[in-house]
């Protein structure tokens, strides 16, 4: 009995110590508290700032451990989306995110034993095949696309289009789809559909923008990821904007969504989706 008690005591003392010495474990612990003290869709910055600091330490101390990279990108996204409404603050956060994303893709290419230059020369399907053996490839391309897209939004969509931001978001989303179209509630289709919804169509820069593709990609996202609130909101918005004859369908999508309750693990994220759904429904009340 005594050895068992001693072992339990040892474990109770060493597990918190492990969380303190391993920056990713420390970041995960802070990330789990990200919604503490939230008011609806607005989170307090403290917990996610703690997570960001821990993940940044992980990237600095263990750069080849790619888990730290994608978790840093995820935490930066949360900070930019859910803790501030300041455009200047968002620009800084998402600029920081896209820089971390590009550095992360460099390390991903190295892990996959392919040069970054060669990776960029491959088609999305070929690039996905080149990095498929690296488990972190999917979240790295997901969050890289997100940061580039959101940085483009706050920087200015027209200016971003002329700088090739849309091309980068499209490529990363297509690589993610080639890796796993179901990943994170069909995130690749969600990102690609959102891009085709919001990106301005600028000759010689974003001539590939296709509003019908926006709807088809978002329908695919809803089909593969019905539990993701944003899939529904984004589809409804695309229908209102580009297929107004289907406005009744869009309203029905939103009405069904706002009857749902947020899950505890995603309370802030889903509260924001519901706020956006209600605003969109009010705007297109019919």
Predicted regions and their residues:
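Boundary at the C-terminal end of the N-terminal hydrophobic targeting segment
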Residues: 17-21
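Short coil turns that delineate tetratricopeptide repeat
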Residues: 63, 109, 135, 181-183, ...
């Amino acid at each position: 009995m005594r050895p068992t008690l001693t072992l339990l005591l040892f474990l109770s003392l060493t597990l918190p110590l492990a969380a303190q010495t391993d920056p990713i474990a420390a970041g995960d612990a802070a990330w789990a508290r990200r919604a503490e003290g939230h008011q609806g869709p607005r989170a307090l910055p403290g917990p996610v700032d703690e997570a960001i600091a821990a993940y940044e330490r992980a990237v600095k101390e263990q750069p080849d451990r790619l888990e730290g990279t994608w978790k840093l990108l995820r935490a930066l996204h949360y900070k930019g989306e859910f803790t501030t409404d300041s455009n200047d603050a968002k620009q800084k956060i998402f600029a920081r995110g896209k820089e971390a994303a590009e550095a992360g893709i460099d390390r991903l290419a190295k892990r996959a034993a392919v040069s970054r230059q060669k990776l960029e020369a491959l088609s999305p399907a070929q690039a996905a095949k080149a990095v498929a053996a690296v488990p972190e490839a999917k979240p790295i391309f997901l969050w890289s696309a997100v940061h580039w897209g959101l940085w483009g939004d706050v920087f200015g969509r027209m200016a971003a289009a002329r700088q090739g931001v849309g091309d980068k978001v499209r490529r990363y989303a297509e690589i993610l789809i080639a890796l796993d179209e179901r990943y994170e509630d069909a995130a690749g289709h969600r990102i690609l559909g959102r891009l085709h919804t919001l990106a301005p169509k600028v000759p010689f820069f974003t001539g590939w923008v296709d509003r019908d593709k926006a709807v088809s990609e978002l329908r695919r996202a809803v089909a593969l990821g019905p539990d993701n609130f944003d899939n529904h909101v984004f589809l409804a918005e695309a229908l209102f904007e580009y297929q107004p004859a289907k406005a009744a369908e869009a309203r029905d999508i939103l009405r069904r969504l706002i009857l749902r309750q947020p899950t505890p693990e995603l309370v802030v994220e889903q509260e924001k989706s519901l706020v956006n759904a209600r605003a969109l429904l009010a705007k297109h009340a019919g």
